[in-house]
Amino acid sequence: MAVKIRLKRMGAKKNPFYRIVVADSRSPRDGRFIETIGTYNPVAEPAEIKINEELALKWLQNGAKPSDTVRSLLSKQGILEKFHNLKYGK
């Protein structure tokens, strides 16, 4: 099973709010997911990002691939750098 970390759209029309979820790559965007690891609100000024660092690192170590948008959110929070240091032992 190929697992991805991606955004699940929530909120009202013209007022998006996203949950950062771990899901099977074959399931639809807003369909079934395995676990929620955070939230992202692009409407707030500045954009509001909340990610559970421990869960994100756990799933990255288990081989979950982040989508492009989630990858940029993780790097803004410094989580990808920590994952890189854990993986390559620096």
From Swiss-Prot:
Source organism of the structure:
Geobacillus thermodenitrificans (strain NG80-2)
Q: Does the keyword Isomerase apply?
A: no
Q: Which InterPro entries match?
A: Ribosomal_bS16, Ribosomal_bS16_CS, Ribosomal_bS16_dom_sf
GO molecular function terms here?
structural constituent of ribosome
What Gene3D superfamilies does UniProt report for this protein, alphabetically?
3.30.1320.10
Name of protein: Small ribosomal subunit protein bS16
* Domain of life from the UniProt record: Bacteria
Keywords from UniProt, A to Z, are:
Ribonucleoprotein, Ribosomal protein
Family assignment? Belongs to the bacterial ribosomal protein bS16 family.
GO process terms (BP) = translation
Q: Does the keyword Ribosomal protein apply?
A: yes
Give the transmembrane region(s): none
**GO terms for CC?**
cytoplasm; small ribosomal subunit
